[in-house]
Amino acid sequence: MTTLSCKVTSVEAITDTVYRVRLLPDSPFLFRAGQYLMVVMDERDKRPFSMASTPSEKEFIELHIGASELNLYAMAVMDRILDQKVINIDIPHGKAWFRKSSANPLLLIAGGTGFSYTRSILLTALEEQPKRHISMYWGGRESQHLYDLAELRLLTERYPNLKVIPVVEQSDNGWCGRTGTVLKAVLEDFGSLANYDIYIAGRFEMAKIARERFCSERDASADSMYGDAFEFI
């Protein structure tokens, strides 16, 4: 692990609770797509955030931070970012990184800002294996929480092997996509997941249910399912 000092180069409020933050580390850095960093608050307090940027983007690190009065843990990090414009990070962490040696079709599943984890893997896969079949499911409470959906739709125009399925729990009048939970959508769309590499990010309970149901009902292999949650559940 390496500790780096990072200058905060930009902060964008992309929804009422999600911030896109770009960091400029003071030294070269290495990580694998799907890994995360720790923001060092003090010697005993380090807080994890997935990197939304890719390993090939050497000039910056991008984070998507969901922070609000209901999430004071992340809000304290945002307060420091906004106040000090400099943070220390510990990098890299996590074992749920993208397995590039596999040729299996990819299933990427994200809930909320778990998208940052799948974004890094998605962009890396398209860059290094541009013909690999990829299905990307992104779930949010409302359509506004699928904040980078326009970027994903542009990617589907460039890569016919990429399928993006957005899912919202509460649809509004202008919503034309799927409604419900992201796991329900996956189960409806796949009769078998036997040969898929599955990467999942979101609430721990979602990851737990996904592993149980995908393995028991859709023949998925637990050894081919990746997510930081699986280190803890």
UniProtKB/Swiss-Prot annotation:
Pfam families: NAD_binding_1 (PF00175)
GO-annotated biological processes: bioluminescence
Keyword Transmembrane: no
Keywords of this entry: FAD, Flavoprotein, Luminescence, Oxidoreductase
Residues involved in pyridine binding: 111-115
GO MF annotation list: oxidoreductase activity
Boundaries of every FAD-binding FR-type domain copy: 2-99
Flavoprotein as UniProt keyword: yes
Name of the top EC class for this enzyme: oxidoreductase
Enzyme nomenclature, EC number: 1.5.1.-
Summary of the function given for this chain in its UniProt record: Involved in bioluminescence. It is a good supplier of reduced flavin mononucleotide (FMNH2) to the bioluminescence reaction. Preferably uses riboflavin as an electron acceptor when NADPH is used as an electron donor.
Family under the similarity heading: Belongs to the Fre/LuxG FAD/NAD(P) flavoprotein oxidoreductase family.
Protein's name according to its UniProt entry: NAD(P)H-flavin reductase
Taxonomic source organism: Photorhabdus luminescens
UniProt lineage: Bacteria, Pseudomonadati, Pseudomonadota, Gammaproteobacteria, Enterobacterales
Gene coding for it: fre
